[in-house]
Swiss-Prot record:
It comes from the Bacteria. InterPro entries: Chaperonin_Cpn60_CS, Cpn60/GroEL, Cpn60/GroEL/TCP-1, GroEL-like_apical_dom_sf, GROEL-like_equatorial_sf, TCP-1-like_intermed_sf. Forms a cylinder of 14 subunits composed of two heptameric rings stacked back-to-back. Interacts with the co-chaperonin GroES. PANTHER family: 60 KDA HEAT SHOCK PROTEIN, MITOCHONDRIAL. The keyword Chloroplast does not apply. This is Chaperonin GroEL. Its EC number is 5.6.1.7. HAMAP family: CH60. The keyword ATP-binding applies. Gene3D superfamilies: GroEL, GroEL-like equatorial domain, TCP-1-like chaperonin intermediate domain.
């Protein structure tokens, strides 16, 4: 086992904070409508230009292992916020840096880190409650467009196209983002269905960039039991191979010899296949398989209807224009099912909704209707160059996450104002002791930091703007894009409540862990032995026969 280097107390914390600052300073230049870009080196090809906080954070690895530990912990804040809320990564990073920076001053002054953390946690609970009170539902297309455009760095076109796509497929509908062929953004709405089951083996992936398996014009085999013996599958595989088209297998499970054979055939290019587990459980699984059959014009191979796997023919297989299978989701686009059959199926499910007694059953049935009737919206991102395309696509995906979060939990005034207003009751909040009160003060100071960074990136004086905004009430704030003060909701500067809440909770969680750290253990760098002297290279003395006296 390699030797370790151990740091204690202030020397450990100082190195950790240095790492936090390096990462946070790189990320926070992107905050706000006038935030700057960050250019990321790539080992091959053009560098990536981004204004996405989490993309910047993920690239940073520091040489000093103790500084790197601090940076990695803040990177976790950004990643976690991105995973849950889909946006707000830069805000979360700025909050974490501020809580750590302020908190370390109190720790250095001799306060108890555990009490500081308890005070921080109390303050965060109070602020999240206040955010919920400030929040209002996001229901109109105009509000959805405004949230989208703010998240996409004040790009109104992106906000508009997201609002349109949500209008077409519903707020719970499936929206995907693809590379476009022109300079303009385009919106395609395709009949389709998404269910939450992904590929059974990563060897089915044929698009490494997106980590998905894409099948164009495939057949779809629907089976209600497990498949483990390849002999049962061979007859239908041979028919599909002759037809020269890919195959998606949806079954209770595909395992053992059957899965191995499918993977080998796929890798060798003999037959392009992918297999996924059927969605749902028990009776719901049968119903959802039937939904897929109706949508794709196929039949579920089940013994109860007199069909067996060995005798299955192409006539029983469903078909679709395109299927995209990810790690956790499968999207069937443009199934070959008849419109009248799909309508009949939707009516049948709606009748079941009316008869359903439990909320859970009703919700699951409504999900099935949405999947059958909703379709899939595809936003095609247009750009002049590949570098611009990647940057724009990342912004569209961020904006999409933000609008979903807004629909889910509502909206609050943006521009860092909601966090400032949510401090309202922190002035009167008391901890159990003096150190906990200090923890509450840390959060009080941290909540103005996002606004300060937005203003600084816009080239204005943060303290002047913060004081002016604090004097105002409600939605009054500073619009950094135009340099004006006013009602931010009327100006269309909105943030999803969920994004603000998750950013604060994650930042406080990781910052609290850092404040309570008193020891760090890292790998000790191995000293490479020196090569030693070459020792005069004996035997070369004088090189006789050469007259040096020229």
């Amino acid at each position: 086992m390699a030797a370790k280097e151990v740091k204690f107390g202030d020397s450990a914390r100082d190195r950790m904070v240095a790492g936090v600052n390096i990462l946070a300073n790189a990320v926070k230049v992107t905050l706000g409508p006038k935030g700057r870009n960050v250019v990321l080196e790539r080992s091959f090809g053009a560098p990536t230009v981004t204004k996405d906080g989490v993309s910047v954070a993920k690239e940073i690895e520091l040489k000093d292992k103790f500084e790197n530990m601090g940076a990695q912990m803040v990177k976790e804040v950004a990643s976690k916020t991105s995973d849950i809320a889909g946006d707000g990564t830069t805000t979360a990073t700025v909050l974490a840096q501020s809580i750590v920076r302020e908190g370390m001053k109190f720790v250095a002054a001799g306060m108890n880190p555990m009490d500081l953390k308890r005070g921080i946690d109390k303050a965060v609970i109070a602020v999240t409650e206040e955010l919920k009170k400030l929040s209002k539902p996001c229901s109109t297309n105009k509000e959805i467009a405004q949230v989208g455009s703010i998240s996409a760095n004040s790009d109104a076109d992106i906000g508009e196209i997201i609002a349109k796509s949500m209008d077409k497929v519903g707020k719970e509908g499936v929206i995907t983002v693809e590379d476009g062929k022109s300079l303009q953004n385009e919106l395609d709405v395709v009949e389709g269905m998404q269910f939450d089951r992904g590929y059974l083996s990563p060897y089915f992936i044929n698009n490494p960039d997106k980590q998905v398996a894409i099948l164009e014009n495939p057949f779809i085999l629907l089976f209600d039991k497990k498949i483990s013996n390849i002999r049962d599958l061979l007859p239908v595989l041979e028919q599909v191979a002759k037809a020269g088209r890919p195959l998606l297998i949806v079954a209770e499970d595909v395992e053992g010899e059957a899965l191995a054979t499918l993977v080998v055939n796929n890798i060798r290019g003999i037959l392009k296949t992918c297999s996924v587990k059927a969605p749902g459980f028990g009776d719901r699984r049968k119903a959802m398989l039937e939904d897929i059959a109706v949508l794709t014009g196929g039949q579920v191979i089940a013994e109860e209807v007199g069909l067996t796997l060995e005798k299955a023919t192409l006539a029983e297989l469903g078909q679709a224009a395109r299927i995209e299978i990810g790690k956790e989701n499968t999207i069937i686009i443009d199934g070959a099912g008849e419109g009248s059959r799909i309508e009949g199926r939707v009516k049948q499910i709606r009748a079941q909704i009316e008869e359903a007694t439990s909320d859970y059953d009703r919700e699951k049935l409504q999900e099935r209707v949405a999947k059958l009737a909703g379709g899939v919206a595809v936003i095609k991102v247009g750009a002049a160059t590949e570098v611009e395309m990647k940057e724009k696509k990342a912004r569209v995906e961020d904006a999409l996450h933000a609008t979903r979060a807004a629909v889910e939990e509502g909206i609050v005034p943006g521009g860092g104002v909601a966090l400032l207003r949510a401090r309202a009751n922190l002035g009167t909040l008391k901890g159990d002791n003096h150190d906990q009160d200090a923890g509450i003060k840390i959060v009080l100071r941290a909540l103005e930091q996002p606004l300060r960074e937005i203003v600084a990136n816009a080239g204005d004086e943060p303290s002047v703007v913060v004081n002016r905004v604090v004097e105002g009430t409600g939605n009054f704030g500073y619009n950094a894009a135009t340099g004006e003060y006013g009602d931010l909701v009327d100006m269309g500067v909105l943030d999803p409540t969920k994004v603000e809440r998750i950013a604060l909770q994650n930042a406080a969680s990781v910052a609290g862990l850092m404040l309570t750290t008193d020891c760090m253990v890292g790998e000790l760098a191995e000293e490479k032995p020196s090569m030693g002297g070459m020792g005069g290279m004996g035997g070369m003395g004088g090189m006789g026969g050469m007259d040096m006296g020229m």
